[in-house]
Amino acid sequence: MTDHVRAAAQRMYAAFNAHDHTAAEEIFTSDFYSHPLGTTGPGSVTRSWQQFHEVFPDVQVVVEDMVVEGDTAAVRTSVRGIPGRQPPTMLEIFRVRDGRIAELWGLSSLRRDS
């Protein structure tokens, strides 16, 4: 059953969009690893989200597509609320363990020049 994998990814995006930084403790495993950032643990997610929301307080991530296979979800999103540019897109891959996100890989057009 892949429902728990889809639910974990959906919880993550809902928490990010609601600026619910404390939810990271419940969404990510204690040994969570972000491959793009090279950071570990839910505390690193909390800090990253806080910094991002300070710069872009109106940001919202919109899920465009999600494909789930086994313990992995691949998600294509668009990012709204970043002024002065075309909405960036992201492709993120999550590995879920025991209902929580354990690993993240990702690509984003956010850092590219517009």
Please annotate each region the language model reported:
Residues 1-114:
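C-terminal and inter-domain tail/linker signature
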